[in-house]
C-alpha cells in the first residue's frame, strides 16, 4: 500500500510539471482559426509527452486509508472513512440522510 501512495505522489508531481505545456498545446490544437499544419504539430507534441503527465493517470485515493475504491472527490476520503468521521462528529454540517 505504501508503494501506491509513493507512486501517486510521483504522478502528481509529473502532472503539475507538465500541466501548463499540455494546456498550451491543447489550446493550439483546438483553435480552428489556425492553419491545419500548426494544429497537427501541436497534436504531435502532445503525443510525444509521457502518458503519465496527464491527469487521467492519477488514481484518486483516500487521504486517510490510501484506499483506491469509492473515493468521494469533494472530501478526498473513501465512503467508509467518511462514514466513520461523520458518525463521530468530526465533519461539521454533514448529517445522515433519512427518508
UniProtKB/Swiss-Prot annotation:
InterPro entries: Ribosomal_uS14, Ribosomal_uS14_CS. PROSITE patterns: RIBOSOMAL_S14. It is found in: Mitochondrion. SUPFAM superfamilies: Glucocorticoid receptor-like (DNA-binding domain) (SSF57716). One of its GO terms (cellular component) is small ribosomal subunit. GO terms for molecular function: structural constituent of ribosome. The keyword Chaperone does not apply. Gene3D superfamilies: 1.10.287.1480. It comes from the Eukaryota. One of its GO terms (biological process) is translation. Belongs to the universal ribosomal protein uS14 family. PANTHER family: 30S RIBOSOMAL PROTEIN S14, RIBOSOMAL PROTEIN S14. This is Small ribosomal subunit protein uS14m. The gene is RPS14.
Amino acid at each position: 500500500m505504501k508503494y501506491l501512495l509513493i507512486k501517486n505522489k510521483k504522478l502528481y508531481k509529473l502532472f503539475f510539471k507538465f500541466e501548463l505545456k499540455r494546456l498550451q498545446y491543447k489550446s493550439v490544437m483546438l483553435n480552428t482559426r489556425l492553419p491545419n499544419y500548426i494544429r497537427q504539430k501541436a497534436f504531435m507534441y502532445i503525443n510525444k509527452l509521457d502518458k503519465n503527465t496527464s491527469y487521467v493517470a492519477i488514481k484518486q485515493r483516500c487521504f486517510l486509508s490510501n484506499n483506491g475504491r469509492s473515493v468521494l472527490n469533494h472530501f478526498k476520503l473513501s465512503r467508509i472513512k467518511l462514514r466513520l468521521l461523520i458518525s463521530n462528529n468530526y465533519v461539521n454540517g454533514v448529517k445522515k440522510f433519512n427518508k
